[in-house]
């Protein structure tokens, strides 16, 4: 819900420090990490609340190939509070890497036999990529809550909680599917039902 506002503020801030910003749009976190390497950026920021309730949001940061954590986060906060920031005139360009991302996965993976899958994206951002990718891999896909909606109207997008995969379990049984896949809100966690 606050994602677009945070994303725009972040992009403006990075540009004001002289950075070249590449906007790949709304994407699952693994695709954002892929983009950093694929586009030779080395760094990336995902605006995400992950598997938290919709009123929460945050940033996952990779700087120069390293995930920002612990001391680096404290240091970044100090620099922001002290206004110890670079200034410059950056740039912004939009790039759609969805097909490149899918092609990379398709090239790297082989499925021994076509699978019948039920895919529950929990209305998270994986819904924009996962069903199509799995079909391109040769799977038969039945979608469950794959329309992206940050209010998560059907269930909380945390596949580690049994109450969030009840419908998925039922559909796997009813359809005699090989597997059920449940993604979290930003697509970097996966629950598997067999």
Q: Where on the chain are the PLM-derived regions?
A:
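Gly/Ser/Thr-enriched, mixed-charge loops and adjacent short helices
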Residues: 57-175
